[in-house]
Amino acid sequence: MTSRFTELAVDCHDPERLAAFWCEVLDFKVIDRSEGKVEIGSWVPTVEDVRARQMPPTLFFVRVPEGKAVKNRLHLDVSPIDGSTEDEVTRLLGLGAAMADVGQGSDRSWVVMADPEGNEFCVLRTLAP
């Protein structure tokens, strides 16, 4: 018996705002929305596709009443594909991200940031040639 990683759910205050932010970051599209929920992805999942092979998971933003209180136990890592890490950090700041300090120190090869609701994520070294 096997399970597939199909989506990552993110509790948040404003699903529309976070979905829009992450669509810009990852070049994803909104693939489903309902009251208090927005799902984004790089593809429109079907049961047949997911059964046939491992596919990239979607991000599912769900409105919850409580706010974020502590550092995330799970976070996303992103890697720029067509520019430098520094240029990507600048772009993400322009989209509404913020720099974050989780005790990582300044001598790291990655940059810790937070999305507009304070969820930490890391920008890793570029994959650009």
Per-range role (PLM):
Residues 4, 36, 57, 72-74, ...:
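Residues that flank catalytic or metal-binding motifs in active/ligand-binding sites
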Residues 1, 41-42, 46-47, 54-71, ...:
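Domain-length accessory/inserted modules outside core catalytic folds
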Residues 42-44, 124-128:
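Short beta-strand-to-coil "C-cap" segments at the C-terminal boundary of structured domains/repeats
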Residues 13-15, 76-117:
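Vicinal oxygen chelate
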Residues 11-56, 94, 102, 107:
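Core segments of cupin and vicinal oxygen chelate
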